[in-house]
Amino acid sequence: MNISIISIGKLKEKYLKQGIAEYLKRLSAYAKVEVIELPDEKAPENLSEAEMLIVKEKEGIRILDKISDDTHVIALAIEGKQKSSEEFAVSLDRLATYGKSKVAFVIGGSLGLSSEVMKRSNESLSFSKMTLPHQLMRLVLLEQVYRSFRINRGEPYHK
């Protein structure tokens, strides 16, 4: 399976970079995983609704440029479906079973994802009803993908 994590914004925190590097190393035994960092759109603090839409659309174009037609796209969004680790593992296993060898997880910028990215997505996933920093979500997502492979192979992993 080829997994892409497409994320808006540059990761700056060293501890997050280290955690991500560790999970990428662990995942290399199970799948080809790449993290694609795309620049965020510079925007002032107090944006109007129209300006927010423009920012999301510009970021959305960058995201969609990185997704091929045969890729199964999972958008990370607060309004997405919440799953347990076991349910997430089953859904990843099903994708592999049904020949979906390319999977892209999409993490938007601070304003979220554009409507075009959401339309292109095959499903939407939420890790919490809470708002979490998109940089942190990369690490949490990689950990859950790793956990899914361990679950699907019946390998031990701490709970």
UniProtKB/Swiss-Prot annotation:
Record: residues binding S-adenosyl-L-methionine: 76, 108, 127-132
A Gene Ontology cellular-component term: cytoplasm
Pfam families: SPOUT_MTase
Location(s), subcellular: Cytoplasm
Highest rank taxon of the organism: Bacteria
UniProt keyword Ribosomal protein, yes or no: no
InterPro entries: Alpha/beta_knot_MTases (IPR029028), RlmH-like (IPR003742), tRNA_m1G_MTases_N (IPR029026)
Catalysed reaction equations from the record: pseudouridine(1915) in 23S rRNA + S-adenosyl-L-methionine = N(3)-methylpseudouridine(1915) in 23S rRNA + S-adenosyl-L-homocysteine + H(+)
Keyword terms of this UniProt record: Cytoplasm, Methyltransferase, rRNA processing, S-adenosyl-L-methionine, Transferase
GO MF, one annotated term: rRNA (pseudouridine-N3-)-methyltransferase activity
Keyword Ligase: no
Principal location class: cytoplasm
Homology family: Belongs to the RNA methyltransferase RlmH family.
Protein's job: Specifically methylates the pseudouridine at position 1915 (m3Psi1915) in 23S rRNA.
Description of how the protein assembles with itself and partners: Homodimer.
Protein name listed in UniProt: Ribosomal RNA large subunit methyltransferase H
Organism in which the protein naturally occurs: Bacillus thuringiensis subsp. konkukian (strain 97-27)
Gene (name only): rlmH
